[in-house]
């Protein structure tokens, strides 16, 4: 697998070696090799992605646009930079999808292990989320219990000679105000 990624990142290609053939076989360009008119001899897909990303920002902060260039011209330039970035991003995604497909054909057990690992991680994440919610529920149940205890305390006061009158007057409606 590591040898099939050779050339994807700068400095990985052994000196004097030819780039690996593209996914279509010998004679067809791969996603990492230089295609005529598209990439320089030493540029990889990652280099091109980085360059197009930098070009997007450069077009947004360019002094040419600040010095009174037409708004439509600015929009066109930015759109072209963004479109190039998106195209290279799609090519990069395609490269990794092809590598994933090759891996699934060559080593299906590896893909199953990765899927099982992802499912275990998902279960752990959800279990932690459940524990977090249970802790919140416990906290709020405790708050409600404390409130209920506080409301019960006034009725548990020792009964004095005027306690009956105090309870009865608490249940009476408030007097009406004259209009």
From Swiss-Prot:
Transmembrane segments: none annotated. Component of the Mediator complex. It comes from the Eukaryota. It comes from Danio rerio. Residues 109-139 form a coiled coil. GO terms for cellular component: mediator complex. Component of the Mediator complex, a coactivator involved in the regulated transcription of nearly all RNA polymerase II-dependent genes. Mediator functions as a bridge to convey information from gene-specific regulatory proteins to the basal RNA polymerase II transcription machinery. Mediator is recruited to promoters by direct interactions with regulatory proteins and serves as a scaffold for the assembly of a functional preinitiation complex with RNA polymerase II and the general transcription factors. Residues 1-43 are annotated as: Disordered. The gene is med28. It holds the Pfam family Med28. Belongs to the Mediator complex subunit 28 family. It is found in: Nucleus. Keywords: Activator, Coiled coil, Nucleus, Transcription, Transcription regulation. Residues 12-26 have a biased composition (Pro residues). This is Mediator of RNA polymerase II transcription subunit 28.
């Amino acid at each position: 697998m590591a040898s099939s990624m050779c050339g994807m990142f700068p400095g990985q290609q052994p000196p004097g070696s030819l780039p690996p053939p593209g996914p279509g076989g010998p004679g067809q360009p791969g996603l990492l090799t230089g295609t005529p008119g598209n990439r320089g001899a030493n540029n990889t897909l990652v280099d091109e992605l980085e360059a197009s990303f930098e070009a997007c920002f450069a077009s947004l902060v360019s002094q040419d646009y600040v010095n009174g260039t037409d708004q439509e011209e600015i929009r066109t330039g930015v759109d072209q930079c963004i479109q190039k970035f998106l195209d290279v991003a799609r090519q990069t995604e395609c490269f990794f999808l092809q590598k994933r497909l090759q891996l699934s054909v060559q080593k299906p057990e590896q893909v199953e292990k990765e899927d099982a690992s992802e499912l275990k991680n998902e279960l752990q994440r959800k279990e932690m989320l459940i524990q977090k919610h249970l802790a919140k529920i416990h906290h709020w149940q405790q708050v409600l219990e404390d409130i209920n205890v506080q409301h019960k305390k006034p009725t548990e006061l020792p009964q004095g000679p005027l306690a009956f009158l105090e309870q009865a007057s608490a249940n009476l409606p408030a007097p009406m105000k004259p209009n």
